[in-house]
Design a protein with these regions (language model features):
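Bacterial N-terminal signal peptides
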Residues: 15-25
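S-adenosyl-L-methionine
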Residues: 26-60, 91-124
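Conserved class I S-adenosyl-L-methionine
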Residues: 59-68
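Glycine-rich SAM-binding Motif I of class I
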Residues: 70-74
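Conserved SAM-binding motif I beta-strand of class I
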Residues: 83-88
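A short SAM/SAH-binding and catalytic strip from SAM-dependent methyltransferases
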Residues: 123-139
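C-terminal substrate-binding/active-site "lid" region of AdoMet-derived donor-dependent transferases
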Residues: 135-187
Length: 187
């Protein structure tokens, strides 16, 4: 075969290979879990107020849905002796939460779940903390009402749950602005 003919075979094969690699990369990206809510950590003053509002104690199991760096569950374990479950779809956030719990010496009191908070099992939670979005709170609401035991507390930073009236609200000053907290007690 002449050199010119080989060149005509190499170029289409190279293009095909590049196209196949691009399609594989796009397919991987499409399958990777991606958070529905942008990560923004709750300031320390808000974390403290959320746990106080929920009246967290040593018998509680605190679930933080969309846990980010794990600060709420870590503080519940450190300050109140509670157990906790950190749930986040983002593997980097779960790794960060696990590392922070290990640094605090609390990893044995906390379970870490890299999964979609819309499908995570909630039945063991006595307290659920949220800093999500109005839409995500509304999507979670039926599951919270169905799966949580009577007396369970739900505390949301910033967002309510539509026409489900909170049992209490609290404004917290974080040094820059006032932030609203909502508490519901499951009946």
């Amino acid at each position: 075969m002449r050199a010119g003919n080989r060149r005509h075979l190499v170029i289409p094969r190279t293009r095909t290979l590049i196209l196949a690699l691009c399609l594989a990369a796009c397919s991987q990206a499409a399958q990777a879990p991606w958070p529905d809510v942008r990560y923004e950590p709750s300031p320390p003053e808000v974390v403290t107020a959320m746990l106080e509002l929920a009246a967290v104690g040593p018998r509680d199991v605190v679930y933080d849905l969309g846990c980010g760096d794990g600060r709420i569950v870590i503080e519940a374990a450190r300050r109140y002796g509670a157990r906790g479950v950190c749930v986040d779809i983002d593997p980097e956030r779960i790794a960060e939460a696990r590392n922070n719990a290990a640094a605090a010496g609390l990893v044995e009191r906390i379970t870490f779940r890299q999964e979609d908070l819309l499908v995570t099992e909630l039945g063991r939670a006595s307290v659920v903390t949220l800093f999500l979005s109005p839409d995500m709170n509304l999507r979670l609401r039926p599951r919270l009402q169905l799966e949580l035991a009577s007396g369970a507390r739900i505390v949301s930073h910033w967002h309510d749950m539509g026409d489900w009236r909170p049992d209490r609200t609290r404004a917290v000053w974080d040094g820059k602005r006032s932030r609203q907290l909502f508490l519901w007690v499951k009946r």
